C-alpha cells in the first residue's frame, strides 16, 4: 500500500504539470467564445512552450545567477505545491509533511524569488512590476489565510487531505460560511494569478502591467518555464478550490484503481466548469485601476470575516 501511495503521489504531480497548460488554453478558449471572437486552439499553450524551448536564450549582460536560476525555482516550487494538493486522491505521502499554511508559504516563496529576479536587472519595468506584485501578495495572503481558517473551524485541521477525507466521511457537513469563503477564494485566485480585474496578462501598457512587467527581460527556455509555472499555479489554485468546496469524487485513502479513474474523470469535469466560470468572470469584468486593488482585496478579507461570524453565530445558536 505504501508503494501505491507513492505511485499516486508522482502521478498527481505529472498530471498537474501536463494539464496546467491545457487548463490555461481552455480558459482562453472559453473567454474568446464568450467575447464572440475566434477562439485559439486549446493546445496553443503547448505550442508556445515548444517554440520558446527551441529558441536561444538572450540575457542581459548584468544578469546574475539569481536571474538565471529563478525560472527553475518557480517551476519546482509550483510542482512541489501540486504534490500537496489532493486533486485526484488523498493518499499522498508528501501532503502529510505540509498543510495549507505551508502551501501559502510555498506560493509566497515563489513570489519573493520572482520579485527579486525582476529587480536584479535594474530596469524600471521590472522594479515596477515587482513592487506591485508584492503589494498584491501582501493584500491577498490575509484573505486566503482566513479562508483556510474557516475550513479549520469546520474540520479542526489545516491539512487539505484531511479536509477532503472529512467531507467524504461526513457529507452532511455543510455550513453557510463556506459560501462566503468560496467567494473570497475566487477573488484571491484572480488576484494571485494575474487575472482580470486585478491584472491583464495580455497587455503591455506600463500603467497596468504587474506580472508581465516582471518577465519582460526573459526569453526562450527561461520564459517558457515561467509561463509554465504560471499555468501550474493557476491549476493549483483551481485544485485547491475543488478540494475545499467541491471535493466530492476525490478518491480517499485505500481507494482502488477504479475509484481513482472515476476521480480523474470528475477532476476533468470540475476543471472544465471552473475554467468556464473564470472565463465568464473575466469577460464581464473590467480591469481595475492599480489603486483599486487594495479595495478589492479588502473586500475579499471582509467576506471571509463575515463567513466566520456566520459560522460562529450559527454554532452559538445550535449550542443554545
State where each predicted segment sits.
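Cytosolic juxtamembrane amphipathic/interface segments immediately preceding
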Residues: 48-67, 123-128, 215-222
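Juxtamembrane/interfacial segments at transmembrane-helix boundaries in multi-pass membrane proteins
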Residues: 150-180
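Transmembrane alpha-helical segments that form the membrane-embedded catalytic/substrate-channel core
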Residues: 21-30, 108-118, 183-200, 272-283
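Juxtamembrane inter-helical linkers in multi-pass membrane proteins
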Residues: 36-53, 200-222
Amino acid at each position: 500500500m505504501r508503494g501505491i501511495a507513492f505511485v499516486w503521489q508522482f502521478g498527481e504531480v505529472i498530471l498537474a504539470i501536463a494539464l496546467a497548460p491545457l487548463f490555461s488554453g481552455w480558459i482562453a478558449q472559453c473567454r474568446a467564445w464568450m467575447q464572440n471572437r475566434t477562439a485559439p486552439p486549446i493546445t496553443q499553450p503547448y505550442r508556445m512552450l515548444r517554440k520558446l524551448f527551441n529558441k536561444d536564450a538572450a540575457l542581459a549582460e548584468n544578469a546574475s545567477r539569481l536571474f538565471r536560476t529563478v525560472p527553475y525555482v518557480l517551476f519546482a516550487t509550483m510542482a512541489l505545491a501540486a504534490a500537496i494538493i489532493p486533486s485526484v486522491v488523498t493518499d499522498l505521502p508528501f501532503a502529510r509533511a505540509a498543510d495549507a499554511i505551508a502551501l501559502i508559504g510555498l506560493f509566497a516563496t515563489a513570489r519573493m524569488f520572482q520579485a527579486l529576479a525582476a529587480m536584479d536587472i535594474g530596469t524600471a519595468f521590472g522594479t515596477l512590476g515587482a513592487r506591485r506584485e508584492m503589494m498584491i501578495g501582501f493584500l491577498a495572503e490575509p484573505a486566503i489565510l482566513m479562508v483556510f481558517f474557516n475550513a479549520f473551524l469546520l474540520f479542526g485541521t489545516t491539512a487539505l487531505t484531511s479536509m477532503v477525507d472529512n467531507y467524504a466521511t461526513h457529507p452532511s457537513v455543510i455550513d453557510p460560511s463556506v459560501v462566503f469563503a468560496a467567494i473570497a477564494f475566487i477573488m484571491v485566485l484572480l488576484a494571485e494569478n494575474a487575472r482580470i480585474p486585478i491584472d491583464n496578462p495580455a497587455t503591455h501598457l506600463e500603467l497596468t502591467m504587474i506580472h508581465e512587467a516582471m518577465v519582460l527581460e526573459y526569453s526562450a527556455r527561461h520564459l517558457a518555464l515561467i509561463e509554465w509555472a504560471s499555468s501550474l499555479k493557476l491549476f493549483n489554485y483551481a485544485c485547491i478550490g475543488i478540494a475545499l468546496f467541491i471535493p466530492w469524487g476525490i478518491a480517499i485513502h485505500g481507494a482502488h484503481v477504479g475509484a481513482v479513474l472515476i476521480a480523474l474523470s470528475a477532476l476533468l469535469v470540475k476543471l472544465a466548469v471552473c475554467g468556464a466560470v473564470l472565463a465568464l468572470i473575466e469577460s464581464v469584468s473590467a480591469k481595475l485601476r492599480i489603486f483599486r486593488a487594495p479595495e478589492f482585496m479588502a473586500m475579499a478579507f471582509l467576506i471571509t470575516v463575515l463567513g466566520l461570524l456566520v459560522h460562529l453565530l450559527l454554532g452559538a445558536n445550535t449550542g443554545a
